[in-house]
Amino acid sequence: MPKALIDTASMAPRMRERIVRPATREILISRVGGSAQEEDITSPVNCGGLGRIRHFQRATADGWPENFLPIDPAARALGLPDAAMMEAQVFQNAACAWRCWYCFVPFELLGGDERRSEWVTAEELVERYAAIDARPRILDLSGGSPDLTPEWIPWTIEALERAGIADDTFLWSDDNLSTDLVFEVLTGVQRAAMAAARYGRVCCFKGFDTESFAFNTGASPEGFERQLERFSRYLDIGIDLYGYVTLTGPSIDSVDEKVARFHERLRSIWRELPSRTVPLRIEAFGPVAKRNAGRDLATAFAVQEAAIAVWQRLNGSPS
């Protein structure tokens, strides 16, 4: 029988409950050290096993656009020159409502398992970050799914200010657009603080239509439209917003038309959005390869190659 699709409306609250303690301002952070993910990390884990250094590279594969995120936003915010690569200190919260087949994080680190993670405050994470020799200028709050714990961002902004390093740190986070918690949990003051800080947010579109969204996330297809609606609401906050998109899907049929419609939807939300959205090329390695062993992904990869050619043409770039 086909696997049942995830009901995001019920899954997201369950995952959130496992990884945040609002009263004590604690977040459950994955312990990368000793996990299956550590095998694919080139630099040693740090910060007591909770952190890792990521090297964000601008260069990508032939036929794909460069990945300027978060390099260009960080450089602008910090007054730095253009760069081909920038390092970031990464922490991952310990849950996600979805189970994307291509996720580089092992699924055992996505379920809010306290045996594989640690309760810490934003202040404690910033203390560990500040103590790193030659610390990266980018602090990346990842996951998991940071949108399950929206408080993490303003709490971290406050902690950076108290530590005296807010002016020379660029805070970056990703957002799966899986919840409305930014509006349900945060105060107007907290949302304004995010807009005023040296902070950027990248929202991850998990496909180009309902079918590809469900295929990629394992969640009910209506989540695709909800992603677009949530991004539209974020624009009103004034955050420095960007997008990622994954272009894999289950069927090659009418890919040109589907991607063109998606591109136009992004333009209708915000004229600049297509140029601020980076397609991520999916590859099978590490946990992704192990998780999908024996699964035929030829069509999914063919779809993304056809889709990127359309995307590049629509963005005015040679494929």
Residue ranges and their predicted role:
Residues 125-128, 155-160, 189-190, 226-230, ...:
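A general structural detector for well-ordered alpha-helical segments in enzyme core domains, enriched
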Residues 162-167, 269-273:
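Short helix-capping segments at alpha-helix termini
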Residues 82-134, 259:
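A glycine-rich, hydrophobic loop/mini-helix early in the fold
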Residues 30-49, 136-157, 177-187, 279-294:
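Short N-terminal secondary-structure initiator segments
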Residues 107-120, 132-156, 163-226, 242:
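Core AdoMet radical
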Residues 97, 208, 248-250:
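Short, solvent-exposed loop/turn segments at secondary-structure junctions
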Residues 10-92, 101, 105-111:
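N-terminal [4Fe-4S]-dependent radical SAM core
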